Amino acid sequence: MTAKRIDGKAFAAGVRARVAEEVARLKEGHGIVPGLAVVLVGEDPASQVYVGAKGKQTVEVGMTSFEHRLPAGTSEAELLALIDRLNHDPAVHGILVQLPLPAHLNADLVINALDPAKDVDGFHISNVGRLGTGQKSMVPCTPLGCLMMLRDHLGTLSGLNAVVVGRSNIVGKPMAQLLLGESCTVTVAHSRTRDLAAVCRGADILVAAVGRPEMITGDFVKPGATVIDVGINRIERDGKTKLVGDVDYASAAEVAGAITPVPGGVGPMTIACLLANTLTACCRANGLPEPQGLTA
């Protein structure tokens, strides 16, 4: 068996196209333009690349992009004052604070200063709690992207056994909550899980989000399972730097029914879902129906 390759790049392009259609409809029918504000503190090179990509794609789908690039020495009071202004700006429907923040800033305090309705990363404690109790919330972008691809590939997820390897607040925990919401039977595995391979082999859906290069091999995969690889790891191989996931693609693809590659799998979905969340936030703020299929 050779697994079907789930093309996240193509799927993300489809999501962005759908968002662009809905944005055009909002403009034409209601005179509303969704706005996304991205806040970057400091000059971390990777963060600068991410912020640039987010701004570019925001404009491409017809939204307004607001970029706030602050010096590394920005005080907590200055950052919180900016967030307060964005919270009260009617042109801004989504706010994203690029992480990590410089060490002198309290990330939890900053994230929880956001208006939960504009927290398009889904990290505010209110959104975390609402997701956990099955209420309408802003859903973290990467798990949302995984869910969209799973729904597209499998249709209904109800009754399937799902194993999420990783328990981070950004991916593992919200992914488990989303799968519970789809009526999966969910196991969250982690570094202390005994006989991890055996646990994973019980999964119809296996989500790897543990941050360890190629840890999940074909021996961990149930024949025919759907494998979602969230990992992004840079390793040295044959004198070159290579990007790999948490799954050993070659061996897992021999067993799985479908699998996401790295790169080109989950990664492109993250920004696409950020745009979808901004659209959703805009619709909610204006009392308009949310587009179907773009949120949990």
Swiss-Prot record:
Pfam families: THF_DHG_CYH, THF_DHG_CYH_C. The keyword NADP applies. SUPFAM superfamilies: Aminoacid dehydrogenase-like, N-terminal domain (SSF53223), NAD(P)-binding Rossmann-fold domains (SSF51735). One of its GO terms (biological process) is methionine biosynthetic process. GO terms for molecular function: methenyltetrahydrofolate cyclohydrolase activity; methylenetetrahydrofolate dehydrogenase (NADP+) activity. Keywords: Amino-acid biosynthesis, Histidine biosynthesis, Hydrolase, Methionine biosynthesis, Multifunctional enzyme, NADP, One-carbon metabolism, Oxidoreductase, Purine biosynthesis. GO terms for cellular component: cytosol. The keyword Iron-sulfur does not apply. NADP(+) binds at residues 166-168, 191, 232. It catalyses: (6R)-5,10-methylene-5,6,7,8-tetrahydrofolate + NADP(+) = (6R)-5,10-methenyltetrahydrofolate + NADPH; (6R)-5,10-methenyltetrahydrofolate + H2O = (6R)-10-formyltetrahydrofolate + H(+). Catalyzes the oxidation of 5,10-methylenetetrahydrofolate to 5,10-methenyltetrahydrofolate and then the hydrolysis of 5,10-methenyltetrahydrofolate to 10-formyltetrahydrofolate. Belongs to the tetrahydrofolate dehydrogenase/cyclohydrolase family. NCBIfam families: PRK10792.1, PRK14186.1, PRK14188.1. This is Bifunctional protein FolD.
